[in-house]
Amino acid sequence: MAKKMKLSDITNMFAGMDVEALEGVTIEGDIEIDLGGLGGGFDPMLAAALGQESAILAQHFARLAGMFGYPVGIGAPAAPAVSPALAAPKLKDLIPAKFDVANIAEWATEIQEVPIGNTSADGGSRGKRVMLGGEKALPFYFDAPMPNRNQVTIDVFDMRIGLAKAVKENYDEVMDSPGEWAKKNVEKFNADMITIHLISTDPLIKDTPAKEAAKTVEEVLQAVDVPIAIGGSGNPQKDPEVLARAAEVSEGERCLLASASLNLDYAAIAEAALKYDHDVLSWTQLDMNAQKELNRKLMKQCNVPRDRIIMDPTTAALGYGLDYAYTNMERIRLAALMGDDELTFPMSSGTTNAWGARESWMVSSPLKEDSDWGPREYRGPIWEIVTGLSLAIAGNDLFMMMHPTSVAVLKQITQTLFGMIDTEQVDVANWIGAEV
């Protein structure tokens, strides 16, 4: 049995010696603490705590001995043994997974189908009816086919306006006649629909009376037999009156009234739509929560049926604007598929807004050190095509466009993805030398 000593014994041992300090001497030993008559067992956690406190106490004793001239070396505690890490089992087979877009459990809600235009069978005079919506998945998956293809409506204005040169050269001779303008869009540029914008009604432009503007709507209805959308000037005070009068003269044709928004009298527009058999374009500005709010008010406050609501979440031009527009539309469509019944409606895009970016129509960059932008005759239409195609992938159904080349290219791409146009198979494995 090892001999036990107290710290006082060590002090007494050197009391009669002329020793000021001990150098190169290590005193090894264990410190015991008598706990007396403690009962209740010795908990492992208590043991660990006492061990830590004992080590601290030993250090204090060593420092105290040094103060009296007897430095005491304290050996560092041994590092605890570390168990070797177990080797991860080798993976023999990958976990089986299958992507079945037609049967994704979270996508349990179908997008509402909304018709635009009444044929004679429906009580109108349109030659065809356009159907939007009905999707059960994101667009263009071959194993989850879209029930209705994308549609394009080409813009017409009730007065001559300033347009980019690349656009204007296609319409210059008809810009003073909305009826002829609409007819050219249908007969030459293959428009699925026509959007007539009554911008002259703006009090800051011509302040055309609503009654006179309604005559322009009648002119367009007589010039073409495709469904039409009717837009105001964007003036929140004037638009409800203008759209109500336009709805009256086009009664029974099931036009799309563009648009109801939170910053104007949406109830008046909804009332006109219900009274004269039209659809409502629910327009918000890149805000999904505002879109939900407006849709909810149209349904709950104004009693607009679900099959008469189309959303326009706003389209911004290429750059950050397109990023926001795409993300907003995709979030809306995913939320709708997952059951948000305030968002389960087809979407419309003002793709013409692409021409609002100066890069689409300017001759060249205003910065001398900038790179060459290329010919605007190509650049502008491509700007509009990319805007529309991006939003088509996000789930957009209806495109409001202007340049005939943009219309033709977007229709060809979306109809090919839809399955309407057969194309030659491309060897994607030989992508370097493939001709597309």
From Swiss-Prot:
How is the quaternary structure described? Answer: Heterodimer of delta and gamma chains. The ACDS complex is made up of alpha, epsilon, beta, gamma and delta chains with a probable stoichiometry of (alpha(2)epsilon(2))(4)-beta(8)-(gamma(1)delta(1))(8) (Potential).
**Highest taxon, organism lineage:** Archaea
Q: Which NCBIfam families match?
A: cdhD, PRK04452.1-1, PRK04452.1-2
What pathway does this protein act in?
Answer: One-carbon metabolism; methanogenesis from acetate
Protein name as annotated: Acetyl-CoA decarbonylase/synthase complex subunit delta 2
**What Pfam families does this protein map onto?**
CdhD
Q: List the source organism.
A: Methanosarcina acetivorans (strain ATCC 35395 / DSM 2834 / JCM 12185 / C2A)
Nucleotide-binding recorded as keyword: no
Q: Which GO terms describe its biological process?
A: methanogenesis, from acetate; one-carbon metabolic process
Under the heading PANTHER family, the entry gives: ACETYL-COA DECARBONYLASE_SYNTHASE COMPLEX SUBUNIT DELTA (PTHR36214:SF5), PTHR36214
The disulfide bridges present are none
Q: Which residues form a coiled coil?
A: none
Q: Which InterPro entries match?
A: Ac-CoA_synth_d_su_TIM-brl (IPR016041), ACDS_complex_subunit (IPR051069), CO_DH/Ac-CoA_synth_dsu (IPR004486), Dihydropteroate_synth-like_sf (IPR011005)
What family is reported? Belongs to the CdhD family.
